[in-house]
Amino acid sequence: SVGHTIARKGLPEFLELAVRMPDVRFLWFGWTDPCLIPQEVRQAMEQAPENVTFAGFVDRETLREAYCGADVFAFMSHEETEGIVVLEALACGIPTVVRDIPVYAGWLRDGKNVYKADSTEAFRQRVTGLLDGALPDLTEAGRRVAEERSMAAMGEQLREIYRRMDILPAARPAHPQRNQARA
């Protein structure tokens, strides 16, 4: 998973999932100032099973390589504003399991472009099904979602809204003409 090491991101459930799946390697990328981590979360991290690695903060290229090398992306966050890391995982073609929360309604569809889960046991079942090949591969549909929600696609949608509202500013030349006369 990727995110701050806090309970809201689903860290306790992530660790419980690792306990239930001891033969699977779990990686968590992200960092939070230890002063901001509640004691119970800090203790859970200190007592994490051996199959869990906290990689901390990594550069963009290392994170991309981690996404591309993953067999499954399990994002157990309880609350999100958009789910950027989900889009990153989908763009990298990783089978993805997310918590079934309202922010994903309408664009992430269970069994169509991702798998959704509402409990640690449901996550275990979906992750196991993906690793064993028992669940259908949704990576191409997931990639399409990432493309549809790319910055370029979102910018074009915003431009269309402005155009329909007749508030699109007049186009400016790409390279404004410069005054050739110099003093």
What are these regions (language model features)?
Residues H4-R20, L36:
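A conserved mid-protein helix/loop that constitutes part of the nucleotide-sugar donor-binding site
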Residues H78:
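Aromatic "clamp/platform" in nucleotide-sugar-dependent glycosyltransferases that forms part
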Residues D110-E121, G129-A134:
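Conserved acidic donor-binding segment of nucleotide-sugar-dependent glycosyltransferases
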Residues P95-V98:
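Short hydrophobic beta-strand element within catalytic cores of glycosyltransferases
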Residues F57-V58, E65-A70:
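Short alpha-helical donor nucleotide-sugar binding micro-motif in glycosyltransferases
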Residues V2, R25-E40, F54-G56:
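Glycosyltransferase donor-sugar binding loop
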Residues P136-R163, I167:
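A charged, aromatic-enriched C-terminal amphipathic alpha-helix characteristic of glycosyltransferases
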